[in-house]
């Protein structure tokens, strides 16, 4: 822990108000909670103008000061005019930490968190407006950031390849909380959602890079016909889930976004967690499933493999046959499933939010020394 007097940090939290906050908001909130629990920081959140606080579970654990512009206008002003300063909302600060994509103007040292560069990997999945916004942000990442915190080695490599100075990049992996739920509570939750049969689970925003067509086609070909597929996550874009699952009838359940406690119970109750994503900056759901003691099947060649280590069955996410074979292996072997459960819990235990916060503090200390 760095030894300072109290340091005031402006910490952007606008993603908590997004229609689909997702993993980036969860990471920002978890780190904020850990940093706030210490005594060395006066951490103050920054957001655009909103009439209401974000909905649970996205309520920040720190006070949030709002600037006088709605989100889109604020981002345009930040990127094109380099104003307004966050200090207009927060007062004087010693450091600014931008936890989302947008880059605020700064007279204090600026830390950025970058989770992924998905739009560079598959720009066709983004609108022209979205690509323009990300290109503006990337230009400012290169020119304005004093340090850039990357959630995986894969993201760090992508940042370097995109022209961010290597000397400014720091690896700061995300964390995961241990999931321990009583069997009775799991059973109650499953019953409430009408999940009466064994099931394969996938969790994540329903968007193209999650590779749902491959997952659904692979599931349709598994050997066991007494197993269902459960999809959990907010609706994203360009994915017609209902059309994909219609041929499988009631063997596929699409539950949408769930409260954290219910989601964790489904992790714990699943036979296997399958996450054949085409691209991830970290792959937090993989570690969440492992923390719940659930066997994992996930993708080679993405940051999910980096997160999973040797504790998952890894597949080519573009191969329906490989995904089907992996599901059959885990569903057909109690010994393999138990081995993956134990290995997964051990792997997840290596990723702690307290460590993420400590590494974040070290980055702050570099700039404030």
Label for each model-derived stretch:
Residues 1-369:
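Carbohydrate transferase catalytic cores enriched for Leloir-type hexosyltransferases
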């Amino acid at each position: 822990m760095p030894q300072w007097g109290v340091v005031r940090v402006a910490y952007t939290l606008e993603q908590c108000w997004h229609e689909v906050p997702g993993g980036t908001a969860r990471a920002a909130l978890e780190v904020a909670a850990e940093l706030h629990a210490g005594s060395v920081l006066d951490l103050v959140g920054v957001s655009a103008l909103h009439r209401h606080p974000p909905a649970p579970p996205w309520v920040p654990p720190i006070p949030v000061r709002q600037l006088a512009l709605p989100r889109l206008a604020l981002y345009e002003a930040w990127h094109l005019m380099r104003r307004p300063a966050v200090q207009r909302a927060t007062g004087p600060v010693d450091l600014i930490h931008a936890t989302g994509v947008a880059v605020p103007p700064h007279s204090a040292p600026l830390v950025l968190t970058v989770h992924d560069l998905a739009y560079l990997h598959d720009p066709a999945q983004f609108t022209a407006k979205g690509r323009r916004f990300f290109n503006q942000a990337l230009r400012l990442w290169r020119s304005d950031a004093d340090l850039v915190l990357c959630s995986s080695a894969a993201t760090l490599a992508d940042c370097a390849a995109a022209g961010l100075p290597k000397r400014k990049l720091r690896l700061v992996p995300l964390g995961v909380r241990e999931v321990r739920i009583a069997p009775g509570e799991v059973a109650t939750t499953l019953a409430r959602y009408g999940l009466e049969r064994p099931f394969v689970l996938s969790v994540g925003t329903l968007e193209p890079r999650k590779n749902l067509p491959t997952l659904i086609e692979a599931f349709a070909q598994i050997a066991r016909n007494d197993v269902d597929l459960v999809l959990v996550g907010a609706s994203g874009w360009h994915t017609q889930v209902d059309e994909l699952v219609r041929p499988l009838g009631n063997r596929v359940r699409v539950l949408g976004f769930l409260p954290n406690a219910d989601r964790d119970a489904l992790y714990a109750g699943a036979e296997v967690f399958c996450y054949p994503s085409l691209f991830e900056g970290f792959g937090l759901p993989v570690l969440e499933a492992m923390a719940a003691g659930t066997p994992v099947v996930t993708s080679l060649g993405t940051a999910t493999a980096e997160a999973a280590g040797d504790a998952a069955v890894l597949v080519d996410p573009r191969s329906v046959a490989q995904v089907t074979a992996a599901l059959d292996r885990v569903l057909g072997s109690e010994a393999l499933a138990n081995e993956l459960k134990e290995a997964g819990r051990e792997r997840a235990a290596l990723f702690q939010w307290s460590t993420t916060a400590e590494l974040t503090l070290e980055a702050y200390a570099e700039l404030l020394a």
